[in-house]
């Protein structure tokens, strides 16, 4: 019913993912956008709006708001009030605004590394101080070192900046983990800003927004969502914050005033279509991504010197190359025809790369073949 196998030639259009390696035989599997055609209901809605031929000013309209509220309740068992919504051009904007209201200049924003690179820059962008705590791997999965979390929170800390589901390690944090974070936020009077942009791409288990745990944590929460990653429409620039507490919401909106533009009207059209009509496509996508995820995990397990954990969400695999003797694995793999994200950009120590498996199987299999061939060339005894 849905076609995820057709390879679309993206080299003909000026997009960031493929333009990076223009004219070079390097397969781009780095930045987090997928190589699939956008869901037809979204394309139809965009065409219908364009065919009106007039682009007037338009804020979020009632049917859009109702659709988002209903979708969040259906997908995440979280009933929100429409008044809690603050519309944004994207979640990166959203967590930068959150940092701007976290205490005073110089105060701390704590996040767990490795993490989506803009997390590492948002505190400094707003005059705050970045504080980090490293996630730890137990051999099978990444998680929290609670003693390290407690040690990282100090008198300066004003906000916990959370990524859930997590980019790049692919975790969907459990209710117990989220409860432990919420307890620390309440004990230290921290705002919790949670980037949940990948919540529609859960491959195993279910996603729980931290604000949905209870009213107490909801009152200190800013939850960021968007359809952009799930339906592959990030450049349409539309998302939203969910802020239950009226006082916190007013502070957030004041920080936005005069600086943050309204979402793109076509982005809002696409958002309504995605949440209203895009779920069959999304479910088929998740099934396809599960197959891709399993291909990646199996292929990496078969290559000596490389290892990865099984992502519970997203279309991203976090690959540990430290046992392969590579000083710069991202550059090494580029030299062998495969473009991956450099793990150092995520606040990780040297030796990690991130692979985007949101692509047709033909593309993925070629990428995995190139990775295996590169390792065989580096270590002929691996063959």
Regions picked out by a protein language model, each given a short descriptive name:
Residues 217, 328-331, 335-341, 346-383:
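PLP-dependent enzyme catalytic core of the Aspartate aminotransferase-like
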Residues 52, 63, 67, 247, ...:
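A non-catalytic, amphipathic alpha-helix used as a structural packing/dimerization or gating element
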Residues 126, 187-188, 217, 303, ...:
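Helix C-cap/helix->beta junction micro-motif
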Residues 215, 219-290:
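Conserved core segment of the aminotransferase class I/II
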Residues 272, 288-297, 308-321, 349:
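Conserved glycine-rich beta-strand-loop-beta hairpin in the small C-terminal domain of fold type I
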Residues 55-183, 200-201, 207-216, 369, ...:
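Conserved core of the PLP fold type I
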Residues 2-90, 97, 274-277, 378, ...:
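N-terminal small-domain helix-loop-helix segment of the aminotransferase-like
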């Amino acid at each position: 019913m849905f076609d995820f196998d057709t390879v679309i030639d993206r080299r003909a259009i000026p997009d960031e993912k493929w333009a990076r390696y223009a004219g070079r035989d390097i397969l781009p599997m780095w930045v987090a956008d997928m190589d699939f055609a956008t869901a037809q209901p979204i394309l139809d809605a965009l065409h219908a709006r364009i065919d009106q031929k007039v682009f007037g000013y338009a804020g979020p309209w009632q049917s859009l708001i109702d659709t988002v509220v209903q979708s969040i309740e259906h997908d995440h068992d979280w009933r929100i009030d429409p008044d809690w919504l603050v519309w944004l051009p994207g979640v990166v904007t959203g967590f930068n605004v959150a940092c701007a209201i976290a205490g005073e200049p110089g105060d701390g924003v704590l996040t767990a590394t490795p993490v989506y690179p803009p997390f590492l820059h948002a505190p400094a962008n707003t005059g705050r101080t970045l504080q980090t705590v490293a996630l730890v791997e137990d051999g099978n999965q990444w998680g929290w070192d609670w003693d390290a979390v407690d040690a990282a929170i100090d008198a300066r800390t004003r906000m916990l900046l959370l990524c859930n589901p997590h980019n790049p390690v692919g975790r969907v944090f459990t209710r117990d983990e989220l409860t432990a974070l919420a307890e620390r936020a309440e004990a230290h009077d921290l705002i919790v800003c949670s980037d949940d942009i990948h919540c529609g791409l859960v491959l195993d288990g279910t996603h729980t927004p931290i604000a949905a745990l209870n009213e107490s944590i909801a009152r200190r929460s800013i939850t960021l969502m968007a359809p952009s990653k799930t339906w592959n429409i990030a450049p349409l620039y539309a998302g939203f914050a969910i802020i239950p507490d009226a006082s916190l919401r007013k502070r957030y909106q004041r920080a936005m005033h005069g600086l943050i533009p309204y979402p793109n009207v076509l982005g809002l059209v696409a958002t309504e279509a995605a949440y209203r009509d895009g779920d069959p496509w999304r479910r088929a996508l998740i099934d396809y991504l599960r197959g891709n995820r399993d291909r990646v995990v199996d292929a990496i397990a078969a290559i000596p010197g490389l290892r990865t954990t099984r992502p519970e969400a997203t279309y991203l695999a976090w690959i540990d190359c430290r046992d392969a003797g590579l000083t710069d694995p991202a550059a090494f793999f580029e030299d062998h025809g495969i473009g991956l994200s450099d793990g150092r950009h995520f606040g990780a120590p040297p030796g990690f790369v991130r692979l985007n498996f949101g692509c047709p199987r033909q593309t993925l299999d070629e990428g995995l073949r190139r990775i295996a061939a590169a390792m065989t060339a580096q270590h002929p005894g691996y063959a």
